[in-house]
A protein has these predicted regions:
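Active-site entrance/lid segments in N-terminal catalytic domains of soluble metabolic enzymes
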Residues: 1-52
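Conserved active-site-proximal phosphate/metal-binding subdomains
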Residues: 16, 35-54, 60-145
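Short loop or secondary-structure boundary microenvironments that flank
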Residues: 28, 57-58
């Protein structure tokens, strides 16, 4: 069993529970990603965890995979990179949004669900979520319906 973690304390708890591997969700990962730079994160976790470590977050090329392995990860974990494949069933509009977005379009906010996550600015805007809203902590008022 592999368990995803965003902090060292989560990795320690998962390790004590006997997991087979850890997926380190570092800064830049899509969705509910972590905020820790992958270099110190891998080093910290590798100091006590000797089983399989996967690194996720901002990995989209062979060079990124090689870097993850050089830093001490056993494997790399990619998700967003595969959304734009022909095999993906994602809508073309969504695929285009990913291709046309820049690093500056990544917004880390807890305003959507109360739990911090990375979103692409165009997707927030498409849902009617403004910068004023995503800058606030808490939940968005979706109304009474």
């Amino acid at each position: 069993m592999f368990h995803d973690v965003i902090k060292k304390r989560h990795a320690e708890k998962a390790s004590k529970a006997g997991v087979d591997g850890l997926i380190l969700v570092a800064a830049g990962a899509g969705g509910h990603g972590g905020t820790i730079n992958p270099m110190p994160f891998i080093s910290e976790v590798r100091s006590f965890f000797k089983k399989t470590i996967l690194l996720s977050g901002c990995i989209s090329s062979g060079r990124d995979i090689a870097s993850a392995i050089q830093m001490g990860a056993d494997l790399a974990y990619m998700g967003t990179r595969f959304i734009n494949t022909k095999e993906s069933m994602a809508e073309e509009e969504y695929k285009d949004m990913i291709i046309n977005s820049k690093a500056s379009d990544i917004i880390y906010t807890a305003s959507v669900s109360g739990v911090a996550a990375n979103f692409l600015k165009p997707s927030l805007e498409a849902m009617g979520i403004t910068e004023e809203t995503w800058s606030k902590k808490g939940k968005i008022d979706f109304g009474k319906e």
